[in-house]
Amino acid sequence: MMAFLLDIITFLQISFSTNIFRINYKWVSDGYDEYKKRLSKLIPLELIELPIAKRTKTGNPKLWMEQEAKTILGKLNDSDHLVILDVNSKIISTEELADKMQNWKFNNPNVVILIGGPDGIDQSIKDIAKEKISISKMTFPHPLVRIIAEQLYRAYTILEGHPYHK
C-alpha cells in the first residue's frame, strides 16, 4: 500500500447570473466512484467539493477567484503537498504521473490535487503550489476533470506492474 493520502479538491457549482445549479453528469460521478473504489484498497482518496463564489453579470472574475482562494486555503493544511491542475503548465503523461506518485509515496504524506473553479486558480494559490501540471490544453467542464481518478489508478497499476495499463 502506498504511504500517502490523496485528496482531490474541486468546485461543485457553476453560476450564471442569479441562477446557481449543480452540474450532475451521473456517468462522471459513476466513473469517479468506480476508480475511487479501486484506489481505496491502495490509496485513501477523498473528493472535497467547494462552493464557487457567487457570480453576477457585472461581477469581477479576479475577485471571484480571490474569494475561492480563501475557501481553498481554509481546507489546506501546512503539511499538504498541493498539486494544481493548470492548463498553462506542463502536460504530463500517465508514466510521468506514475513517477510523481512514486515520489509522493516516499516524500509527501498528504497530496492534494486542486481542480480550479470556472475562472481558473488565483495567483495566491499558484504561488503556494508545490507542483503544477496539466492534463490537457483542452478545456473541460470542471466535474469532468474528476476523471483524474482513473489516471491515478492507471499510474498506480504501472508502479505495481499490473496489466491494466497495457
UniProtKB/Swiss-Prot annotation:
- Is Magnesium a UniProt keyword of this protein? no
Q: Name one Pfam family in it.
A: SPOUT_MTase
Which residues are S-adenosyl-L-methionine-binding? 85, 116, 135-140
Q: Does the keyword Glycosyltransferase apply?
A: no
| Compartments, as annotated in UniProt | Cytoplasm
UniProt entry keywords in alphabetical sequence? Cytoplasm, Methyltransferase, rRNA processing, S-adenosyl-L-methionine, Transferase
Q: Which reaction does it catalyse?
A: pseudouridine(1915) in 23S rRNA + S-adenosyl-L-methionine = N(3)-methylpseudouridine(1915) in 23S rRNA + S-adenosyl-L-homocysteine + H(+)
Principal location: cytoplasm
Task: Report the EC number(s), separated by commas if there are several.
Answer: 2.1.1.177
GO cellular component, alphabetical, reads:
cytoplasm
The record's section on InterPro entries has: Alpha/beta_knot_MTases (IPR029028), RlmH-like (IPR003742), tRNA_m1G_MTases_N (IPR029026)
Which Gene3D superfamilies does the entry link to?
Answer: 3.40.1280.10
Gene Ontology terms, MF aspect: rRNA (pseudouridine-N3-)-methyltransferase activity
Per its UniProt entry, what is the enzyme's top EC class, as one word?
Answer: transferase
HAMAP family xref list: 23SrRNA_methyltr_H (MF_00658)
Sequence similarity: Belongs to the RNA methyltransferase RlmH family.
Spell out the subunit comment. Homodimer.
* General function of this protein: Specifically methylates the pseudouridine at position 1915 (m3Psi1915) in 23S rRNA.
Task: Give the protein name, as stated in the record.
Answer: Ribosomal RNA large subunit methyltransferase H
Q: Which species expresses this protein natively?
A: Francisella tularensis subsp. holarctica (strain LVS)
